[in-house]
Amino acid sequence: MLRMSAWLGLSLCAALAAIAQAAQTEHLIFLSTQLRPIEEAQRMRNLVLKDFSGEVDYITDLPQRFPTRIETERQTSMHSIDLVGALHGELQPLVALDALVPLDDLAGRLSGRGISNPLLTLGKLGTAHQLYIPWMQAGYIMVANKQALPYLPSGADINALSYDQLATWASTLQEKTGKRLLGFPAGPHGLMHRFFEGFLYPSYTGGVVVPFRSEAAEAMWIQFASLWRNVNPNSTGYNFMGQPLLSGDVWIGFDHIARVLDALRQKPDEFIAFPAPAGPKGRGYMPLLVGLAVVKGAPDIAKAMALIDYLTQPKTQVTLVRTVGFFPVVNAKLPPDLDPGLRMGADAIAKMQSAKDALPALAPVGLGQRGAEFDRVFLETFQLIVLRGQEPRPVLDQEAETLKRLMSETSAPCWQPDPPNTGACQVQ
């Protein structure tokens, strides 16, 4: 532990020194927790930023050091960072530090670019002001082998499916082919917990923590257990859905886009990508949204805003897709020569976030190092109810106690789509 603390301290000092050196050049300093690998960072510097009118020093840092760095500059009044780029959940703690410049006027000037209202609302970080401008995004999608399309329920729109229709589709496939062809990444290193936290729970209950043990949640688990009877039993070993889709073991799958992109790239003519289904409360989905924010005390706020303007221009957003694989947040016409797998993924995410019933559900916020414990609550609930066949009510009541204790001990407030609150988020 002492070694780790010392390492973080030395790393932070080195990083601050790098920023100080960059500041002496009077370049704009852009600090990002994303695109950190050397190749991606070089693409940012050499391809994405090359047409900006000013000189930019693009510097990356680990997410766990990000708030400490901002707080250190605030406490010492030695400001060098002009612009920050980070995930929504990484920017959220800066609200309590009162560290971000309101960007309401800039958001108004960018209103014609087509950034969706749900994404702009996320950029307010629960306040009345626009504290970050959405920059780029990734996410989770559904992918289907085109062989499955003739078995869609009558009248179903694949871009506006409901969970009931998905269940009927999977049941029909099993009936007609004799195989369970729906798959989920429920393996030990899969992202099944994100499906529950960002898709299923919001779609059926309208929240995640608050309605965890509600009657709506109980009904949801009963329905999902029924659906699971038509899910490929090997799903409990799937960590990435790309390979089972390519092999044909699965005809319909859910996963993070990065984990199915290989299938879309290898056989683009055989697959279709589409939004996640909707439930009674809406089309829950978990946006992986990266925002751009200006730190209070920034040496050149005007230039920082100019860089935000540049990075959200459609042309720059297309360059981001091509070079680093993140998708646009603005209305950007994708070029005809774009990798077809990337195009399918971008289209599916765009359709999901622009759906009339879209219900964004954030990744857990405020849990610190205990995020895995939160995930475990949902995975254990799934294992007990769906895989072991236990009754939902006693399982939900038992797991709710674990969830209550975790929220209380971390003092984590509610995050969207649960309603705003003061203090720890409470399970009803």
Q: In which residue ranges do the predicted regions lie?
A:
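Short, polar/charged alpha-helical segment
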Residues: 34-57, 378
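Extracytoplasmic "Venus flytrap"/periplasmic binding protein-like
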Residues: 46-115, 151-152, 251-252, 329
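Hinge/lid segment of periplasmic solute-binding proteins
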Residues: 87-141, 167, 272-274
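Short, solvent-exposed loop/beta-turn-alpha elements that line the ligand-binding surface or hinge
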Residues: 105-115, 158-159, 201-220, 265-266, ...
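Extracytoplasmic/periplasmic solute-binding protein
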Residues: 127-136, 140, 164-209, 250
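Glycine-centered hinge/linker elements that transmit conformational signals in sensory
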Residues: 167-173, 207-238
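Extracytoplasmic/periplasmic substrate-recognition and gating elements
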Residues: 226-232, 264-329, 362-363
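Long, aromatic- and glycine/proline-rich binding clefts that accommodate carbohydrate-like moieties
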Residues: 269, 323-380, 384, 412-428
